[in-house]
Amino acid sequence: MAEKRNIFLIGPMGAGKSTIGRHLAEQLHMEFFDSDHEIERRSGADIGWVFDVEGEEGFRIREEKVIGDLSEQQGIVLATGGGAIKSRETRNKLSARGIVVYLETTIEKQLARTQRDKRRPLLQTEEPPREVLERLAQERNALYEEVADFVIQTDDQSAKVVANQIVKLIGM
């Protein structure tokens, strides 16, 4: 039997990477990982604490290591953090080690999906959330597109429907 390829989900916070990833892994009988949860597991601290103590740079170093380690496995679905693609090394590893699916969403949907979530350090600032999300989109959207094998709009679809679309797109 051929080895199952890895599937890496990228995109902004609130795009549905973790929820869609769980559905996708279940459907394909693959193991699911969320890079943020793995960082928390390995560090013994939540993402907010890592950001507070080590700053975004310290968090990104941890994220790069976790994604590097996880992407060496075979047959996994990995939901990455929204900023993971900022690292060229991470982008290269994702491209080389699996199928990269960019889950695209609008700022409006991101706001609706993240407004009550206190576990998103980049939104816990004085800057209004809309401005933060718009700035992040400007910084990151081209990087998502650069590394993506496929792009799927998640706005008005359930996680299960998006997971089904991914299965059809990648032919697994």
From Swiss-Prot:
Pathway: Metabolic intermediate biosynthesis; chorismate biosynthesis; chorismate from D-erythrose 4-phosphate and phosphoenolpyruvate: step 5/7. It comes from the Bacteria. One of its GO terms (cellular component) is cytosol. ATP binds at G14, A15, G16, K17, S18, T19, R120, Q157. InterPro entries: P-loop_NTPase, Shikimate/glucono_kinase, Shikimate_kinase/TSH1, Shikimate_kinase_CS. Binds 1 Mg(2+) ion per subunit. Its cofactor is Mg(2+). Belongs to the shikimate kinase family. NCBIfam families: PRK05057.1. PANTHER family: SHIKIMATE KINASE, SHIKIMATE KINASE 1, CHLOROPLASTIC. This is Shikimate kinase. The lineage of its organism: Bacteria, Pseudomonadati, Pseudomonadota, Gammaproteobacteria, Aeromonadales.
